């Protein structure tokens, strides 16, 4: 084990023990955004006059982000260290102690759906493929062999990208069914109906069981294996097509970030655009996001059509929903909670509803983000489509997404497009 590995492991342990809530930094004068909504930070920080808590960083140490990307020697070692970025006593049911952030921003952040690891759900059958163990991390293999002997009853250590995808899809459906300005405490029945679609039960249309089943049959992903952004997007597309009553179309580009309007309209509706979720799997660099894409990536969260960004390294996927300056705010799926009993006709208790939301802020500097990600947009109608195209074409810096009127033909092996230089790389799950 080299010195770099030891240093990274030590840093990860420190991050787990010292996990201060981010402060509304005085040197960042920009507003904070949450999925297209802007919140000014110049309001009084504490109407009651109480002082904000001091940072918990260790003296003499630089700020450590809650989920700094690691450079580990193997996926097994990384999985073994994949502890939640939030200590157990700081889960979603605890209100934020910070008085520095605009209350309206915190209310909006808390109203976003947050899916995490769950345990004690109906077993997901194991694959009978003899090569399956080779695709699993060491911790998952051990748990499968000694604990979940009859199938997976928890997704700890392998389901974080699925949970991030569920969060993205649920918040898109929330905008359609509850409204963008919906906040917790209202429309409880409708909120419970939406959550029932994602229950950890094979009968629920967007359950982890359905994701795993489709991933195994169409994406080559074994039960217990970590999903990548591309496989997650394909699962969302297939499961949404099966669940007709959600009235949501899905347009997926897993081989790049080019959007072709003729293809999009075939899916969204040739006679008028109906609500359509656009999912783009991209890779914006090698080890980190290339700086030329920073501004375009920040702008994506500010678009009113944005439903967030899901992605990260294996065993470390996050769901990004906010931005301020160079920092991205995210929901962390790496917490294991008991599965909620599934009953589509019943209302969840306040305690169970609390486990799908958090007011606890977490953020990551853009330079620490992994370049592989799944970007989501919700286009509700023709006006939304026109506004989205206008915003994309006026972006500052290198654009991430390009829109074309027609699908372009495949280019020959020895032909090269002029604009192919410095282009966003298509995302392949196996590249991680």
Swiss-Prot record:
GO MF term (any one): cysteine-type endopeptidase activity
Name a biological process GO annotation. protein transport
Q: Where is this region: Disordered?
A: 74-97
Q: Name one GO cellular component term.
A: nucleus
Q: Where in the cell is it found?
A: Cytoplasm; Nucleus; Preautophagosomal structure
Quote the catalytic residue positions.
160 (nucleophile), 332, 334
EC number of the protein: 3.4.22.-
Which key words are in the record? Answer: Autophagy, Cytoplasm, Hydrolase, Nucleus, Protease, Protein transport, Thiol protease, Transport
This enzyme catalyses: [protein]-C-terminal L-amino acid-glycyl-phosphatidylethanolamide + H2O = [protein]-C-terminal L-amino acid-glycine + a 1,2-diacyl-sn-glycero-3-phosphoethanolamine
User: Which InterPro entries does this UniProt record tie to the protein?
Assistant: Papain-like_cys_pep_sf, Peptidase_C54, Peptidase_C54_cat
Q: What does this protein do?
A: Cysteine protease that plays a key role in cytoplasm to vacuole transport (Cvt) and autophagy by mediating both proteolytic activation and delipidation of ATG8. Required for selective autophagic degradation of the nucleus (nucleophagy) as well as for mitophagy which contributes to regulate mitochondrial quantity and quality by eliminating the mitochondria to a basal level to fulfill cellular energy requirements and preventing excess ROS production. The protease activity is required for proteolytic activation of ATG8: cleaves the C-terminal amino acid of ATG8 to reveal a C-terminal glycine.
Similarity section: Belongs to the peptidase C54 family.
Q: What is this protein called?
A: Probable cysteine protease ATG4
The gene that this protein is the product of is: ATG4
